Amino acid sequence: MFLPQEIIRKKRDNLTLSQQEIQQFVAGITDNSVADSQIAALAMAIYFNGMELEENVHLALAMRDSGRRMHWKDLNLPGPIVDKHSTGGVGDVVSLMLGPMVAACGGFVPMISGRGLGHTGGTLDKLSAVPGYNPFPEPELFRKVVKDVGVAIIGQTSDLAPADRRFYATRDVTATVESIALITASILSKKLAAGLDVLVMDVKAGSGAFMPTMQKSIELAERIVKVGNGAGVATTALITEMSQPLASTAGNSIETREAVRYLKGDQRNPRLHEVTMALCAQMLIGGKLAADEADARAKLQAALDSGRAAEIFGRMVTALGGPADFMEHYDRHLAPAPIMRPVYADRAGYVGAMDTRGIGMAVCALGGGRRLATDVLDFRVGLSQFVELGQNIGKDTPLMMIHAADEASFEDAARRVKAAIRIDEAAPSELPLVYQIIRGE
């Protein structure tokens, strides 16, 4: 007989749960036979006592199996099923370039993405700025686009890992979001449901990261790599820098515009380019599409230089309902904000530090992000042309450009971004873009 309270008691007492106990509890989350209070109690017990590696694998797999699983074998695809997941940040537009770049090199990328919440932008919101783009296609259309184009970026549907959605909603209101075991199971349940062969994780560190310290970022990356590999997906993680916005823009339409310009070769922010190439390279190596880092980077550069990656992005947009001429006339399709003006520093000096989370919250306050999951976005607004850490600036140097809907929101954003940037007498030491690569053993 299944008694949720006995499973809670075991974990409360720091004992190891069996695969059957975990499967029973997750089934109860899915069919509502387990109460919210019991989910909360188990979450708190796991928060304090953690999970053994094997328990964590069983939890991720049980949540994967709570809903529909995608299968690709029947399509006889001539390459591996690969994907990337980021813990999120500001100006993290990597997915929009990475998907088509990897597809151009022979990978198949069924990317299931999320919307933004709080200071972090969401890949889905950036693509939703494209007129007509359907982020929730029928499963057969999704499979067709992955097969024919090589990449499809869509949103999570209610039938994928439904246990995770209920578990997360409970964690969100019970101060248990930060549990590394539960973050790991939550991320991997959705990725495992997508039927991947290879997963590369981008775990951010710095003032705009989800994890509060470098040590916590490393702990999360190591756990995801171990659990992912334990669940049968070749998983690698990169710890990447998020002490300043990654791209030259933060917002929805403006980040999508930057992604198109990157793919077409019109503008490539060096920091964004390096992180994108590093993540793509690990996907190609993991999928056996490249022998090593140098081989992978050469193939990726060729995909950009030939225009193949840009062509694939355009085909994906069109296949999912967007304009057929999007790549040629993206400026016509992505509406600008009514107000676009710079904000200046109060004094000269070096850009010493950035509160990247604060910069993300400025985008949110402009209307480009969500405080609540139900908020409606203004795709036009955001920030661009950021100064960079270590840059020597004068009082006449713009800190960034603000794209606002009205004067009041411009003034509010200006106050926020000025407060988020520290000007020092001396330049800070340079930070690496990729701190560490963590591979499965």
Swiss-Prot record:
Highest taxon listed in the record's lineage: Bacteria
Pfam families noted in UniProt: Glycos_trans_3N, Glycos_transf_3, PYNP_C
Metabolic or biological pathway: Pyrimidine metabolism; dTMP biosynthesis via salvage pathway; dTMP from thymine: step 1/2
SUPFAM superfamilies reported for this sequence: Nucleoside phosphorylase/phosphoribosyltransferase catalytic domain, Nucleoside phosphorylase/phosphoribosyltransferase N-terminal domain, Pyrimidine nucleoside phosphorylase C-terminal domain
Gene3D superfamilies linked to this entry: Nucleoside phosphorylase/phosphoribosyltransferase catalytic domain, Pyrimidine nucleoside phosphorylase-like, C-terminal domain, Transferase, Pyrimidine Nucleoside Phosphorylase, Chain C
Keywords: Glycosyltransferase, Transferase
Keyword Isomerase (UniProt): no
InterPro entries: Glycosyl_Trfase_fam3, Glycosyl_Trfase_fam3_N_dom, Glycosyl_Trfase_fam3_N_dom_sf, Nuc_phospho_transferase, PYNP-like_C_sf, PYNP_C, Pyrmidine_PPas_bac/euk, Pyrmidine_PPase_CS
GO BP annotation list: pyrimidine nucleobase metabolic process; thymidine metabolic process
GO function terms (MF aspect): 1,4-alpha-oligoglucan phosphorylase activity; thymidine phosphorylase activity
Catalytic activity reported: thymidine + phosphate = 2-deoxy-alpha-D-ribose 1-phosphate + thymine
Record-listed E.C. numbers: 2.4.2.4
GO CC term, one of those recorded: cytosol
HAMAP family: Thymid_phosp
Purpose: The enzymes which catalyze the reversible phosphorolysis of pyrimidine nucleosides are involved in the degradation of these compounds and in their utilization as carbon and energy sources, or in the rescue of pyrimidine bases for nucleotide synthesis.
Protein family per UniProt: Belongs to the thymidine/pyrimidine-nucleoside phosphorylase family.
Subunit note: Homodimer.
PANTHER family documented for this protein: THYMIDINE PHOSPHORYLASE (PTHR10515:SF0)
The protein, known as: Thymidine phosphorylase
